[in-house]
Regions:
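Outer-membrane beta-barrel domain signature, especially the mid-to-C-terminal portions
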Residues: 30-31, 179-182
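Short, surface-exposed acidic
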Residues: 52-56, 158, 182
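Predominantly transmembrane beta-strands of Gram-negative outer membrane beta-barrel pores used
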Residues: 70, 98-107, 115-123, 130-180
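Alpha-helix N-cap/helix-start motif
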Residues: 80-81, 110-111, 154
């Protein structure tokens, strides 16, 4: 009389990120916008994400403060992700490929954060021809130009330059409003 015992090894899921959301450029640009599309404004419409006012793009995620979030651009920390006094994010939506947002339960490699993790991933430049675009809105102007790099040893590459300029300082100067002056 022989007893045969068989078992299977239980699989361990290394990635169990329940609150991860991936946004692409189409989703960011189709969201309702305050003057122009903004990734932080898009994220503020998600469950668990709040803001203090219509004039703040700061992300309050699940009761945490904005300084408890980790904001990254292509995996590198961005320490001041706000533009125009916090009304907009510094990220130009014309160059965003996608954004990965973790509203909790994120991996330990992002340790020391209690709020959220946002990794904005830039898109590649145009590798076939030189193109550009410009946009003028009520409070800012932005431009983008991109094109291919010369082929070198069979490799293709591209370049991209993007910039945004607000009119805040010119409006303040025109209205003669003293800011920080005695």
């Amino acid at each position: 009389s022989e007893v045969l015992v068989t078992a299977e090894r239980q699989k361990f899921e290394r990635s169990m990120e329940s609150s991860q959301i991936a946004l692409d450029l189409r989703e960011i640009n189709s969201a309702p916008a305050f003057v122009e599309p903004d990734i932080f404004r898009t994220l503020q419409m998600l469950p668990g994400v709040q803001t203090t006012s219509d004039f703040s793009s700061a992300l309050y995620v699940r009761g945490s403060t904005p300084d408890q979030n980790l904001i990254m651009l292509d995996g590198i920390a961005v320490y001041n992700p706000y533009h125009l006094g916090g009304i907009f994010s510094t990220f130009n939506t014309d160059v965003i490929k996608e954004a990965d947002f973790h509203a909790g339960g994120f991996p330990a490699r992002y340790g020391g954060r209690m709020g959220a993790i946002l990794n904005v991933i830039n898109r590649e430049g145009n590798t076939t021809k030189t193109t550009g675009m410009a946009n003028i809105s009520l409070i800012s102007s932005k431009a983008l130009i991109e094109g291919p790099l010369p082929k070198w040893r069979g490799m293709k590459g591209s370049w991209m330059i993007s910039g945004r300029r607000t009119y805040f300082d010119t409006v303040i100067d025109a209205l003669k409003i003293p800011l920080g002056q005695n």
